[in-house]
Regions:
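Ser/Thr-rich, low-complexity intrinsically disordered terminal regions
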Residues: 1-116
Length: 116
């Protein structure tokens, strides 16, 4: 069973608006940006075991890419997976549902910041 989650969503907003809202969503969840490139619409972030006061059990890392579908529409594709104690991708022994929970919360925060 793969522990990584890949999800893609489309929004009727410009790619810059989605990128800014995504960074706010990461900050709202207590994530740490590892890398960001506004020109290409990409960023990577890590999240601790504890998010919004809830202990999930595993650290996670997310990479996202925002692309413009049209002038007023864009798509965000995210990949999220659990990390071990020293920051490597966890290939086995991860707790079930952690990645799904983080991606669900991320999209909820993203949509809140987009004003959906």
């Amino acid at each position: 069973m793969p522990f990584e989650v890949k999800q893609e969503k489309q929004y009727p907003k410009s790619s810059n608006a989605v990128y800014d809202a995504a960074l706010k969503a990461v900050a709202g969840l207590g994530g740490k940006l590892l890398r960001q490139n506004p020109d290409s619409g990409e960023f990577e972030a890590t999240f601790d075991k504890k998010i919004l006061g809830q202990v999930l059990g595993d650290r996670t890392q997310m990479s996202a890419k925002i692309t413009a579908s049209s002038e007023e529409s864009s798509t965000i594709a995210v990949e999220i997976y659990p990390l071990d104690a020293i920051g490597r991708k966890l290939m086995f022994g991860a707790r079930k549902g952690v990645s799904e929970t983080v991606v669900t919360w991320f999209f909820a925060h993203l949509e809140h910041h987009l004003g959906k």
